[in-house]
């Protein structure tokens, strides 16, 4: 007979910067000016699916762990495709820019320049 398995996956993808990946000299200050060169925005955690909230919506037949893993991997790819958009990366960059600008102004710098390292389409630094 026909076997069916429908699972609902929940997750939170967090986009941001990892300062551990900043290159040497990423922040340069001179008098009242500072230039901050941030690492590229990326997905901060690959374990974004909340397994505890995953539910089987409809299940009939017998399913192996491998079958469930295939569905899990498909859910991961779908979430990544929907969330890692140029628009969301741009929003995350703007948030990082705003936070660093506020921080540098509060420290006392008057002129603040925030830049991001460039990456290729796969997210590797150029």
Question: What are the roles of these predicted feature ranges?
Answer:
Residues 1-126:
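Domain-level marker for long, solvent-exposed, non-transmembrane regions
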């Amino acid at each position: 007979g026909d076997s069916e398995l429908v699972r609902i996956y929940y997750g939170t993808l967090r986009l941001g910067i990892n300062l551990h990946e900043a290159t040497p000299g990423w922040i340069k200050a001179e008098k009242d000016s500072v230039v901050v060169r941030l690492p590229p925005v990326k997905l901060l955690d690959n374990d974004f699916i909340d397994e505890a909230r995953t539910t089987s919506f409809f299940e009939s037949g017998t399913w192996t762990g491998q079958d469930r893993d295939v569905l899990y991997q498909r859910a991961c790819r779908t979430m990544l495709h929907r969330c890692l958009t140029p628009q969301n990366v741009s929003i995350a960059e703007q948030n990082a820019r705003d936070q660093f600008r506020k921080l540098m102004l509060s420290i006392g710098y008057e002129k603040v320049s925030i830049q991001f390292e460039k990456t290729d389409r796969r997210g590797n630094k150029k």
